[in-house]
Amino acid sequence: QKNNWENTFISLYSFSKSYRLTGHRIGAVITKKERLCQIEKFLDSVTICPNQLGQIGALFGLRKSSKWLKNERLKILNKKIQVIKEFENLSNWKLKGCGAYFAYVEHPFSECSSIVTQKLLSKKAILSLPETIFTPTNKKIIKKHIRIAFANINSSQIKEMFKRLKNFQI
């Protein structure tokens, strides 16, 4: 346990993502009171105010949708588990990190990630993003990592994606 963790802890929560309030920026911040006062000063100085419809949607979600939210969370976690298991069976590809929506992967090819992502799209219809989008421009970067989104596909589509990855060659 880190000493004085309360001096650095900030937790952000997005009602917009949880309750699918697309386009509405509704969220919550948890931190110590003194920091929250400073955050409030910042928010007062920028032009950001969630519209009333988004606020009503978030409040409705909090009051009425906990069962639905629990089921959605389980679906997301099951997809994540499936992706992790599928990568265990995919030779030479290394899963570096897996969240609720994306997998961060090291590919087995000698080409850089920008070329690999282009070939994945043109040959296998898999849209992915090269690591160069997420990292600073630095010649020392390996450039062998890609990010694959899986939140918008179902279980059978995840299986199909891994069949395509298994048979993929540059």
Regions found by a protein language model. Give the residues of each.
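Active-site C-terminal subdomain of aminotransferase-like
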Residues: N4-W5, E34-L53
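PLP-dependent enzyme catalytic core of the Aspartate aminotransferase-like
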Residues: W5, S122-L127, P136-I170
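Generic structural signal for small/hydrophobic residues in well-ordered secondary structure
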Residues: F9, G27, A58, I76-L77, ...
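Short, conserved active-site loop motifs that form the nucleotide-linked donor/cofactor pocket
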Residues: F9, W93, I126
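Short beta-strand-to-turn element immediately C-terminal to the catalytic PLP-Schiff-base lysine
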Residues: G27-K33, R63
